[in-house]
């Protein structure tokens, strides 16, 4: 029985620059061969004009209405970082950042690359601060670094996810104070804890040896932790029960691993797939093809297209696409006997450096899929294809139908 390899370029969608997008400019003969022999269209990850987060977009793509199931990004980050969540826990996505003496954000990612020894130093400092603040307020504090500047913070106790972000979401703005979003003791306490953790980290970070070294190297110091997306663990029917599909996900980013785990996918990692713009995809693609014999759908997440977009790096984004395509090439014959989906979870145009709400290209190859006249995978071409305009939440039902796994609606 055939299965599906689903390749997702995070933030892969873009807007034309000089008449081309990164997908259009990239030399990707394997993906374009599948495109020329498949059906294409455009996809609204959530709905037309809605600017998706990566969390809400992946919920929709995996077949779950984010307006119903989304409970905040933090819980998915924690799941993906192998932090076990208990009922009542509140989790936040964190960014290591750089602020000036007035608390104004200079870089929301502290230069993005955080060396392992730097991440360990931050974890050690946060453990010390967390224990002290936790004793003061009667809560447990857990912090864990994940990839690059990213991390997760979990609060356990009489806490609430109903607090505002401290991340201002832009450079040049002052790091915000967490404020309760409801009139409850739990929300007020949570805001106090978050603000004290943030303040004490910034005060203590100045003395970290890693920051002395970073300054000598001409790099930005790590002197702030920005929190956003406070949330709790949602109750979600597993994908096997909801859609009769055995699914696996291969991802290097905690958020995507977490969303996949939340919907009941088996989650894998691969050598070279760290969730960065420098990822090497050979082992990840090899693993994906091997897993296709055990699963109905194998999802492969490519983070580098989003990271390069946020950095405004057109050529870097093209390079990520081309490296993935090159890793696919040795397996083309095997893929031709199965189904292949290529799409994005949202557009992150290089010229905007942020998520935007336009549709992204989508391609479905399969032995029995209608072949349209689109020959190149790109925003400039896929809109002409046979798939038309679909939503993210439509992908899994479409795949279930081709695989013969979906139930008939009515008689």
UniProtKB/Swiss-Prot annotation:
Any one Pfam family here would be PhosphMutase
Which EC number(s) does UniProt give?
Answer: 5.4.2.12
Keywords in alphabetical order: Glycolysis, Isomerase
Q: Could you tell me what reaction this enzyme catalyses?
A: (2R)-2-phosphoglycerate = (2R)-3-phosphoglycerate
**Pathway the protein acts in:** Carbohydrate degradation; glycolysis; pyruvate from D-glyceraldehyde 3-phosphate: step 3/5
- GO-annotated biological processes: glycolytic process
Q: Name one molecular function that GO assigns to this entry.
A: phosphoglycerate mutase activity
Q: Which InterPro entries match?
A: Alkaline_phosphatase_core_sf, ApgAM_prokaryotes, Metalloenzyme, Pglycerate_mutase_ApgM, Pglycerate_mutase_ApgM_sf
Q: What does this protein do?
A: Catalyzes the interconversion of 2-phosphoglycerate and 3-phosphoglycerate.
Which family does the record assign?
Belongs to the BPG-independent phosphoglycerate mutase family. A-PGAM subfamily.
Matching entries from NCBIfam families are given as: apgM (TIGR00306), PRK04024.1 (NF003104)
Matching PANTHER family, A to Z?
COFACTOR-INDEPENDENT PHOSPHOGLYCERATE MUTASE, METALLOENZYME DOMAIN-CONTAINING PROTEIN
Q: What is this protein called?
A: 2,3-bisphosphoglycerate-independent phosphoglycerate mutase
**Species lineage:** Archaea, Thermoproteota, Thermoprotei, Thermoproteales, Thermoproteaceae
Q: What gene is behind this protein?
A: apgM
């Amino acid at each position: 029985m055939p299965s599906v390899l689903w390749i997702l370029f995070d933030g892969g969608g873009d807007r034309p620059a000089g008449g081309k997008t990164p997908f259009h400019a990239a030399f990707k003969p394997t993906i374009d061969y599948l495109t020329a022999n498949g059906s294409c269209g455009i996809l609204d990850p959530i709905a037309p004009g809605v600017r998706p987060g990566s969390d809400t977009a992946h919920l929709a793509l995996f077949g779950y209405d984010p307006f119903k199931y989304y409970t905040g990004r933090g819980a998915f980050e924690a799941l993906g970082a192998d932090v076990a969540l208990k009922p009542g826990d509140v989790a936040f996505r964190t960014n290591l950042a750089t602020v000036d003496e007035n608390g104004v954000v200079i870089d929301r990612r502290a230069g993005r690359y955080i060396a392992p020894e730097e991440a360990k130093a931050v974890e050690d400092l946060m453990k010390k601060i967390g224990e002290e603040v936790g004793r003061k307020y009667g809560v447990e504090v857990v912090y864990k670094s994940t990839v690059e500047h990213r991390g997760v913070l979990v609060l356990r106790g009489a806490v609430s996810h109903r607090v505002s972000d401290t991340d201002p979401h832009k450079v040049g703005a002052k790091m915000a104070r967490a404020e309760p979003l409801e009139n409850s003791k739990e929300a007020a306490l949570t805001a106090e804890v978050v603000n004290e953790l943030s303040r004490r980290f910034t005060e203590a970070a100045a003395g970290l040896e890693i920051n002395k070294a970073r300054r000598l190297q001409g790099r930005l110091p790590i002197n702030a932790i920005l929190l956003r997306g406070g949330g709790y663990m949602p109750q979600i029917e597993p994908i096997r029960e909801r859609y009769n599909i055995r699914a696996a996900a291969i991802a290097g980013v905690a958020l995507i691993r977490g969303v996949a785990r939340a919907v009941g996918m088996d989650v894998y990692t691969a050598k070279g797939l760290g969730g960065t713009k420098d990822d090497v995809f050979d082992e990840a693609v090899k693993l994906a093809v091997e897993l296709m014999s055990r699963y109905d759908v194998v999802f492969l997440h490519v983070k580098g297209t989003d990271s390069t977009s946020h950095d405004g790096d057109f050529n870097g984004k093209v390079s990520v696409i081309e490296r993935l395509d090159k890793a696919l090439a040795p397996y083309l014959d095997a893929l031709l006997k199965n189904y292949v989906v290529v799409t994005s979870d949202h557009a992150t145009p290089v010229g905007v450096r942020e998520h935007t709400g336009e549709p992204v290209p989508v391609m479905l190859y399969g032995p029995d899929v209608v072949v349209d006249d689109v020959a190149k995978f790109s925003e400039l071409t896929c809109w002409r294809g046979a798939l038309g305009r679909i939503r993210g939440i439509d992908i899994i039902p479409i795949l279930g139908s081709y695989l013969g796994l979906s139930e008939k609606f009515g008689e």
